[in-house]
Swiss-Prot record:
Naturally occurring in which organism (per UniProt): Alkaliphilus oremlandii (strain OhILAs)
Pathway: Metabolic intermediate biosynthesis; chorismate biosynthesis; chorismate from D-erythrose 4-phosphate and phosphoenolpyruvate: step 2/7
Cofactor: Co(2+); Zn(2+); NAD(+)
Domain of life according to the entry: Bacteria
The protein, known as: 3-dehydroquinate synthase
Manner of cofactor binding, per the entry note: Binds 1 divalent metal cation per subunit. Can use either Co(2+) or Zn(2+).
């Protein structure tokens, strides 16, 4: 088991990474849960694999649990209300500690619950998907959707610890596993060209799961840690982590969170960002084609057959990065270089949306 620290300046917490951590979770978290009431928040697709063994291990603790339906639609104010209701019905006080066991939805929702219930209770992240392990379990962002608006309600709230059991990836469906590469490619575009070359050279092995992703996870975590350390509250530099997300959130919202997994939407958002950058002559054609072809290798089956341009643009206007009613875009401009743009004409944005409407722009 690897034990390391996530150092975000004002906040530091331990990260434990290895295989079969859930087999000994009761021992590993013993110091964190002493004197606490444990509230396990998980999802049905995860509970069916790991729920009963965990219940058995934690039964000696003061212990409650809640299972939500898997999927982005559960990241709602209704689900949030159900969890708060259960916490109050259980008469759980500020000595509660929430264990968020699951993917990105559980991490975002569990973090939001922990940060708001009684003005804050302790939180432990136990991410079980590749996307949650490389990205959403680190950095302190929490959130739920409101209507069709992605992450409209949220807080910044850090866990006491993160436990990454890499063996949970063995039960992860192939589609969810591959979806995480949208975020991994994003990190390569932001600051690690060698990572992109590795993803390109070994794409078949990654897709077949015959090549370890352990190093990828650590690289993404360290890159995010370094960025968040400089801008925890997302007011400047941290915005580069939203590369591909302006479009992605618009796509997810306009399809009612039903058609695309988040990582898939991010991958398509990277295509959009690269295409928009090319139209504005910010990025070289050769690098643009490399980016698109790399994404195509991982997401060739995730075409956009019908694109609600108006709906996506409307959703993008609600993006949290926007200021003065202008849509903010993070665009790739060169290897390991992305920039923030705030004054792109909406007509150019709509043209780029139309150009990617029927798939990937690759030679």
């Amino acid at each position: 088991m690897l034990e390391t620290k996530i150092n975000l300046g004002k906040v530091t917490y331990p990260l434990y990474m290895g295989r079969n951590l859930l087999d000994n979770l009761d021992v590993l978290i013993e110091d964190h849960i002493e004197g606490k009431t444990v509230f396990l928040l998980t999802e049905d697709n995860v509970f069916k694999y790991y729920g009963n063994p965990l219940l058995e291990k934690l039964k000696s603790s003061r212990f409650k649990y809640h299972i939500i339906e898997s999927g982005e639609t559960s990241k709602s104010i209704d689900t949030y209300g159900e969890i708060i209701h259960e916490l109050t019905e259980n008469k759980q006080d500020r000595d509660t500690i929430i264990l968020a066991l699951g993917g990105g939805v559980i991490g975002d929702l569990g973090g939001f619950v922990a940060s708001t219930y009684m003005r804050g209770v302790d939180l432990i992240h136990i991410p079980t998907t590749l996307l949650a392990q490389i990205d959403s379990s680190i950095g302190g962002k929490t959130g739920i959707n409101f209507g069709a608006i992605k992450n409209l309600l949220g807080t910044f709230y850090h866990p006491r610890a993160v436990y990454m059991d890499l063996s949970t990836l063995d039960t992860l469906p192939k589609r969810e596993y591959i979806a995480a590469f949208g975020e991994i490619i994003k990190y390569g575009l932001i600051g690690d060209y060698d990572l992109l070359l590795d993803l390109d050279q070994h794409h078949r092995a990654y897709l077949d799961r015959t090549r370890s992703v352990d190093d990828l996870i650590l690289k993404c975590i360290r890159m995010k840690e370094n960025i968040v350390l400089k801008d925890e509250r997302d007011s400047g530099m941290r915005q580069v982590l939203n590369l591909g997300h302006t479009f992605a959130h618009g796509l997810e919202s306009s399809t009612n969170f039903q058609k695309f997994l988040h990582g898939e939407a991010v991958a398509l958002g990277l295509i959009f960002a690269s295409n928009l950058s090319l139209k504005l002559k910010f990025i070289a054609e050769e690098y643009h084609q490399f980016v698109n072809q790399l994404i195509y290798k991982y997401f060739s089956d995730r075409y956009i057959l019908q694109l609600d341009t108006e709906g996506i643009v409307e959703a993008m206007t609600m993006d949290k990065k926007n200021k003065e009613h202008r849509i903010t875009f993070i665009l790739p401009v060169d290897k390991e270089k992305v920039e923030i743009f705030k004054n792109i004409p909406i007509e150019i944005v709509e043209e780029s949306l139309e150009e990617i409407k029927y798939g990937f722009r690759c030679k």
